From Swiss-Prot:
The gene is ttcA. InterPro entries: Rossmann-like_a/b/a_fold (IPR014729), TilS/TtcA_N (IPR011063), tRNA_Cyd_32_2_STrfase (IPR012089), tRNA_thiolation_TtcA_Ctu1 (IPR035107). It catalyses: cytidine(32) in tRNA + S-sulfanyl-L-cysteinyl-[cysteine desulfurase] + AH2 + ATP = 2-thiocytidine(32) in tRNA + L-cysteinyl-[cysteine desulfurase] + A + AMP + diphosphate + H(+). Its EC number is 2.8.1.-. Belongs to the TtcA family. Its cofactor is Mg(2+); [4Fe-4S] cluster. This is tRNA-cytidine(32) 2-sulfurtransferase. SUPFAM superfamilies: Adenine nucleotide alpha hydrolases-like. Pathway: tRNA modification.
Length: 283
């Protein structure tokens, strides 16, 4: 921890530490691979985790992993210097996923899905080959609430980015220690620390992405009610299945069984769902 931490640094340490404790993200002896993309979020994550590691008495390890995807203009010289100055173990691995993405995705379409899929595969493989049991990602509170809104509006389901999950190959735990942290605090901290940010030219060149639209919508709502983002985050921790419509989580069809009555009720269906099916139509 800095000898004289700023107010925003104290805030980041508090909320990151709280998230780690709330979800039991890191345990004694863990080898945590921090995915350092070169953006403000991952720089903040690595810096704060390193301070918490020191505070814990080195009860866990951290390692910075950066994937150079061979994008034009990529320059990691400042990143290498920064990592060396911080004495943080690291590796910058070069894999040309850029050419694959450019070849497969038509001009004007978003590259994010394929790009992240390729990146995820490389990250999992590297973690497995090098004995890291935890993979830390830099998604923050606003990423979580934007993803929730996107899922509802564009996919028709309720999901977001979990704070902790088991990887698809069942070999790693993926954690998001910044899940309580506001993006504005990360921006302030990144400015204070003068991180050597490496911009993502691949994504930044594309306008009108869904995520930007949703972020703008949430920002507009927050002007009238500043609690909107935090309320959305709280909603992810306060599901009420009986107030929703998912029959996998609530037995709506047989609620009559729970009635407190002396009368005998016959729970025989008058209609069945098949009678009202329409082909290829969604309500």
């Amino acid at each position: 921890m800095s000898s004289n931490p700023s107010s925003v640094e104290k805030k980041l340490l508090h909320y990151t530490g709280k998230a780690i404790a709330d979800f039991n993200m890191i345990q004694r002896g863990d080898r945590v691979m921090v995915c350092l993309s070169g953006g403000k979020d991952s720089f903040t994550l690595l810096t704060i985790l390193n301070q918490l590691r020191i505070k814990s008495g080195n009860k866990f390890e951290i390692f910075a992993f950066t994937l150079d995807q061979a994008q034009p203009g990529w320059n990691d010289a400042c990143l290498r210097q920064w990592l060396a100055e911080k004495s943080i173990p690291h590796e910058i691995l070069t894999r040309d996923t850029y050419s694959i993405v450019k070849e497969k995705i038509p001009e004007g379409k978003t590259y994010c899905s394929l790009c992240s899929r390729l990146r995820r595969g490389i990250i999992y493989r590297y973690a497995e080959e090098n004995g890291f049991n935890k993979i830390a990602l830099g998604h923050h509170r606003d990423d979580l609430v934007r993803t929730l809104m996107m899922s509802i509006l564009y996919n028709g389901d309720i999901r977001s980015m979990p704070p902790k999950l088991l990887s698809d190959n069942k070999k790693h735990i993926v954690i998001r220690p910044l899940c309580y942290v506001q993006e504005k605090d990360i921006i302030t901290f990144a400015s204070e620390q003068a991180f050597p940010i490496i911009p993502c030219n691949l994504c930044g060149s594309q306008e009108n992405l869904m995520r930007k639209k949703v972020a703008s919508l949430i920002d507009q709502l927050a002007i009238e009610n500043p609690k909107v983002p935090s309320n959305m985050l709280h909603a992810l921790q306060s599901l009420k299945p009986s107030q929703l419509m998912d029959q996998n989580f609530w037995n709506f069809k047989n609620l009559e069984d729970g009635l407190e009555t002396t009368q005998s009720i016959q729970c025989e269906e008058v209609f069945n769902a098949q009678e009202f099916e329409l082909e290829d139509e969604k309500i």
